[in-house]
Swiss-Prot record:
Protein name (record): Ring protein 1
Coiled-coil portions: none
Domain of life (superkingdom): Viruses
Source species: Bacteroides phage crAss001 (Bacteroides phage PhiCrAss001)
Job description of the protein: Forms the tail multi-ring barrel with ring protein 2, ring protein 3 and ring protein 4.
């Protein structure tokens, strides 16, 4: 896995694509759409950045960050207690107010999301959301990793999608499209290995997780802070 990622602006990949005579009609808007589709389809964790944002919960709900892709974890801002996923079908729509300290408030706090809204089991609170987002530049355009394998794979993906349209219109032969599809298939596998295979440090943390005699059942509450620590056995 790539440990250190530098970022470049999307026009870099667009300039490379426009060198091809069959891609001269490609514009920035289309390139952005294909880039977001590619990032979503590949699901590479290092392509996203981790962010933490504190939001206000009012009347059991709050507004999620606009750049949120997926939620890592949610916790209460005041004491760091983690919220689990909501399992109550009616928890997000309570029929009456609950006083602080009653049986309802003493249960485990929970949350669920619908669209750009987060619902919690607590009426008024501040929560910290750890989430993954796409890296953006000052103009709000997505930044992409400055990695030669990633750039080539993205270039072939956009080329493949554009050539599919040209093939449907009868402007290119099947051999041209098949060659691009084959190139992309091989490069996609290489890109996946480049970004998914753990580094030596990550392998050490994974090994420590597996080699445990006593299961750690409280790591969720701590945000998995100590999950990768080595377990020591004291012999008295």
């Amino acid at each position: 896995m790539v440990n250190n990622i530098n970022w470049v602006k999307l026009p870099v990949i667009l300039d490379r694509l426009l060198r091809h005579p069959l891609l001269t009609d490609l514009n920035l808007e289309t390139a952005i759409q294909y880039t977001l589709d590619f990032i979503s389809a590949m699901g590479l964790p290092n392509v996203y950045v981790d962010k933490i944002e504190t939001i206000d919960i009012k009347e059991y709900r709050g507004e999620l960050p606009c750049d949120l892709i997926s939620i890592n974890q949610v916790r209460l801002h005041k004491n760091g207690i983690a919220l689990r996923a909501m399992t109550d079908n009616f928890n997000a729509y309570p029929t009456h107010d609950h006083k602080e300290g009653d049986w309802y408030e003493r249960g485990e706090p929970s949350f669920k999301t619908q669209g750009r809204v987060i619902f919690t089991s607590i009426k008024h609170e501040k929560v910290d959301i750890s989430y993954k987002a796409i890296m953006l530049d000052d103009e709000g355009l997505p930044l992409i990793p400055d990695n030669p394998i990633f750039l080539k794979t993205l270039e072939l993906y956009i080329k493949k999608e554009w050539f599919t349209i040209l093939f449907d219109m009868g402007k290119i032969s099947p051999a041209v499209l098949n060659n691009t599809q084959q190139e992309y298939a091989f490069k996609a596998g290489q890109c996946n290995n480049e970004f998914v295979i753990p580094s030596v440090s990550e392998m050490e943390a994974i090994t420590n997780m597996w080699n445990q005699l006593i299961p750690r059942v409280t790591e969720f509450r701590r945000g998995f802070k100590n999950l990768g620590d080595k377990e020591y056995i004291r012999v008295h």
